[in-house]
Amino acid sequence: MPPKTKGKGRKAATRKKKKNSSPGVEAEAKHRLVLLEKELLQDHLALQREEACRAKASEDRLKQRLQGLEAELERTQSEGRAVYAEMSRQRQALQKELGTRSKRLEEEVRGLRERLETCQREAKTAREEAERALREQDGTLTELRAHVAHMEAKYEEILHDNLNCLLAKLRAVKPQWDAATLRLHTRHKEQLRRFGLNPLDL
């Protein structure tokens, strides 16, 4: 826009000169004016081309930047999708593993509960059998003690009867033994005297 202002100033000066000049000078002034206008148009076109080039370069840079941003956005989205897919895969794998582990643990717990119930039943049965065996043993011991006490009483009675019978027999045969002993003693004394021995010296 300064060139236009400059042109206007020249036009005004030319007009002033036109009033005070001859026709030849006026033609020359018009020619100069045309040249100036042409120069101004050329400068204006050059400025427009320069501005257009700068705008085109700026547009190209913006397009390039936009393409870079779009590519980066696409790469980021692709990475995000890849990360999401990987996380989904890992989550599914983890859920599957947890499901398998949970199922295995449930089966182990079920098996342990069954074993515990079996052991409890066996322990209860063994305890009942042991208690029954102890009761039977106590009953048997009681019967044996009673039988032993009865046998001891019987044996003691038989022993006393036998001893009494033996004593009675001894008392019955004692006079006979005493007489036999006396006869034997007398016979020995006579035999000793026969051999010239004194029984009192022996």
Curated annotation (Swiss-Prot):
Q: What is its main location?
A: cytoplasm
What taxonomic lineage is listed for the species of origin? Eukaryota, Metazoa, Chordata, Craniata, Vertebrata
Q: Which InterPro entries match?
A: DRC12-like
Q: Which UniProt keywords apply?
A: Cell projection, Cilium, Coiled coil, Cytoplasm, Cytoskeleton, Flagellum
Q: Which GO CC annotations does the UniProt entry carry?
A: cytoplasm; cytoskeleton; motile cilium
Q: How does it assemble?
A: Component of the nexin-dynein regulatory complex (N-DRC).
Q: What does this protein do?
A: Component of the nexin-dynein regulatory complex (N-DRC), a key regulator of ciliary/flagellar motility which maintains the alignment and integrity of the distal axoneme and regulates microtubule sliding in motile axonemes.
Q: Coiled-coil regions in this chain?
A: 54-149
What organism does this protein naturally occur in? Rattus norvegicus (Rat)
Query: Where is the stretch described as Disordered?
Result: 1-29
Compartments it resides in: Cytoplasm, Cytoskeleton, Flagellum axoneme
Family recorded in the similarity comment? Belongs to the DRC12 family.
Q: Where is the composition biased (Basic residues)?
A: 1-20
Name used for this protein in its record: Dynein regulatory complex protein 12
